[in-house]
Amino acid sequence: HNDKDGAVDFTQGVEYYKNADPGESIPGLMHVDLGGYHVNDIEFVAAFDIDQEKVGKDLSEAIYTYPNNTYKFADVPKLGIEVQRGMTHDGLGKYLKQKITKAPGPTADIVQILKDTRTDVLVCYLPVGSEDAVKWYVEQAIAAGVGFVNCLPVFIASEDYWDGRFKEAGLPIIGDDIKS
């Protein structure tokens, strides 16, 4: 959603580090193996965006679509994952409104897509300031029975309310803010 798009880096990083040796110290990667999971255990099964230039494209193509201008450090092969129309809420701020056009049509049925794709964890990389949109996606994750990684500085995992909701549902939640 923004010029320095964490989702682009994440998608490229999974490709770039997929064969990393867990026994080595790898620059740019804190842990090759985290809790028994290797980078190559990450599989993309669904993707959501609101930009008309990205919706409908394969994820591998959409990540390099304007206004994203993140440095390309890995060639992401075609993934067979069509970007679906996401929910906007407050995810399109004043700055982004000048750069992208919201995709037409209704929001995809996020819960059903997460269920149909047998998603385990929803990783949320919305633009900073998208508090309402993040909370909406949190609700979708809980309804679909999937874990949630909040990469934004919006208090979700650290809030008793959300923590309790995830515990009650027996789901993991990680966050808040990818840098924390």
Predicted feature residues:
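N-terminal glycine-/serine-/threonine-rich beta1-alpha1-beta2 phosphate-ribose binding loop
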Residues: H1-E139
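Conserved anion/nucleotide-ligand pocket segment
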Residues: N2-D5, I174-S180
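Short gly/pro/ser/thr-enriched loop/turn and capping motifs at secondary-structure boundaries
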Residues: V8-D9, F155-E159, K179-S180
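Residue-level detector of anion-binding/catalytic polar loops
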Residues: D120, G147, P172
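Rossmann-fold NAD(P)-binding glycine/threonine-rich loop
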Residues: P127-A143, C151-P172
